[in-house]
Curated annotation (Swiss-Prot):
InterPro entries: SFM1-like (IPR007364). The keyword Phosphoprotein applies. Present with 2520 molecules/cell in log phase SD medium. The keyword Transport does not apply. One of its GO terms (cellular component) is cytoplasm. The lineage of its organism: Eukaryota, Fungi, Dikarya, Ascomycota, Saccharomycotina. S-adenosyl-L-methionine-dependent protein-arginine N-methyltransferase that monomethylates ribosomal protein S3 (RPS3) at 'Arg-146'. This is Protein arginine N-methyltransferase SFM1. The gene is SFM1.
Amino acid sequence: MKYIIEHMEEGFSEWVILEYSQILREVGAENLILSSLPESTTEKDIPQRLLKLGLRWTTKDLKGINEDFKDLELLKDGRVCLLDPRATIDLQPEDATKFDYFVFGGILGDHPPRDRTKELKTAYPNLLISRRLGDKQMTTDTAIRTTQLIIKDRIAFEDIKFIDYPEFRFNKNEATEMPFRYVLDKEGKPILPEGMLDLIKKDSAQSLDDLLM
């Protein structure tokens, strides 16, 4: 099971670095590809924290990934799943046998959401098949975590425990509500990337848009 994140933007915010780092730790560097980086991108543009975790990246788009990564199975029409908030069918455990790759357009962590999935579906009408992860916005690491639970662990979406729009309180007068859905851990707490809570606390005076950029 391979995951592809269509980065499609310049630079890496601290938020994105923490998310990608967590994804790499959870799925393994061999199972994650960052694609569609700006053509001018060189290795020095990639954060060292991600390189040390083994991040594999390319400026190629979905159709060109196999040119840079000969070890990967070919991306075949109808065997690539696009996680699309506007899809009509939710991802199910039985989809594990239907898809080789799962593509995330960066749209799941945007607030407000940008319709990047529409761009991808237009660009690759035969390659991609859309599936949904419920009707709430997720961060990219949450979306990949949810996909793993469904596809790898064979847990139905409706059986996964989530929390929507959790509030993180730092003191009596200071709290931040996150406008996303998160998976809950065994203790009933939302799963965040390592260091994310500190970042939210540090930047709680900023707007969420500033934090994500």
